[in-house]
């Protein structure tokens, strides 16, 4: 049985080819034809401060369970698919624990993981160590790759990633800032986590590209997530006459910073934050503080794509979510759905 499981794991990565900038996985036919079915593990934050990232996951998994009810075609044969979902609780330690449970206890054949390096990285590391193929998303590729001590000359053997990079978000932020008259002085809010360390990195993050475009970046240093006092950062920004604030913070920290900035009389012309402002609920929680803020948009109902699984357009997928949940669409819907598109496409293109 262990031999069969290893064969199935190894099979999943043998015929890799690029899909949307990420390596897709290939699976030999005979391994699954003889198997009782495929187990897919899915890890994301359902609770804790990162929970908004996982808000749409139950909806997407319900869609997939319905779609997979009769199995999927692999080489003309129907193969049963089971999805086992786990909550990272917004904790890197917990993410690693549930990944190991899925690998060692549930015996999953393929792992899918989404939402921030604090989730994707420990799950990917567990899969790399245990030789389980893994596809991850919703974390810029730099903190996922270099945050795991990746070597560009070697890459990884079992773990694959689909998402944009810091070069993309920096270019978009800069384009927006150039449209507003400012003194080009930028204050950075970079926490001591995978995203913050990558975004603030002098070689791979914001400092270099901003300097090349004539912007100066003041980085007052790292802080812990769930910070309750941003007085030091606000004082530094005021002293340096900062007119643009950027960074990558969790929703609770954005609210704390914006509240304290208002209380302390700091009024930047532009506030562009990654991560914290992606979700309708997070903006609603800010009240009037949410007016005039900006952030990146990496999926929306207006994106011109159609699902390879359900044939829904992005607009139809968003409408389906809103109808089922009575909540406004949220960006991670598209990438949670895309994880399953890549997984199924790879499985359907298997070879003996």
Which residues does each PLM region occupy?
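Extracytoplasmic ligand/sensor domains, especially the bilobed periplasmic-binding protein
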Residues: 108-221, 271-295
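Extracellular/periplasmic bilobal clamshell ligand-binding domains
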Residues: 230, 241, 341-352
């Amino acid at each position: 049985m262990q031999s069969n499981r290893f064969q199935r794991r190894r099979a999943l990565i043998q015929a890799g080819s690029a899909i949307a900038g990420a390596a897709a996985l290939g699976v030999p036919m005979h391994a699954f034809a003889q198997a009782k079915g495929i187990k897919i593990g899915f890890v994301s934050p359902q609770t804790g401060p990162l929970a908004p990232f996982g808000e749409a996951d139950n909806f997407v998994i319900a869609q997939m369970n319905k779609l997979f009810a009769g199995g999927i075609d692999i080489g003309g044969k129907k193969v049963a698919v089971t999805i086992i979902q786990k909550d990272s609780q917004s904790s890197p330690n917990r993410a690693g624990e549930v990944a190991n449970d899925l690998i060692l206890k549930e015996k999953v054949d393929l792992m899918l993981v989404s939402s921030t390096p604090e989730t994707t990285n420990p799950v990917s590391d567990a899969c790399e160590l245990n030789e389980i193929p893994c596809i991850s998303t919703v974390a810029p590729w730099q903190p996922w790759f270099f945050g795991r001590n990746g070597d560009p000359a070697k890459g990884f053997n079992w773990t694959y990633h689909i998402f944009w990079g810091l070069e993309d978000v920096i270019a978009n932020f800069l384009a927006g800032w150039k449209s507003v008259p400012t003194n080009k002085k930028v204050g950075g809010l970079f926490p001591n986590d995978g995203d913050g360390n990558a975004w603030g990195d002098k070689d791979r993050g914001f400092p270099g590209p901003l300097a090349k475009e004539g912007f100066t970046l003041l980085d007052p240093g790292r802080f812990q997530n769930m910070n309750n006092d941003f007085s030091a950062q606000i004082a530094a920004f005021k002293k340096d006459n900062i007119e643009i604030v950027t960074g990558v913070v969790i929703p609770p920290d954005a609210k704390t910073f914006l509240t304290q900035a208002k209380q302390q009389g700091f009024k930047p012309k532009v506030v562009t934050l990654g991560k914290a402002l992606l979700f309708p609920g997070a903006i609603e929680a800010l009240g009037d503080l949410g007016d005039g803020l900006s952030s990146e948009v990496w999926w929306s109902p207006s994106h011109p794509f159609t699902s390879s699984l359900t044939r829904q357009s992005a607009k139809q997928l968003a409408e389906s979510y809103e109808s089922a949940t009575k909540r406004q669409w949220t960006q991670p819907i598209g990438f949670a759905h895309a994880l399953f598109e890549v997984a199924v496409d790879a499985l359907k293109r298997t070879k003996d």
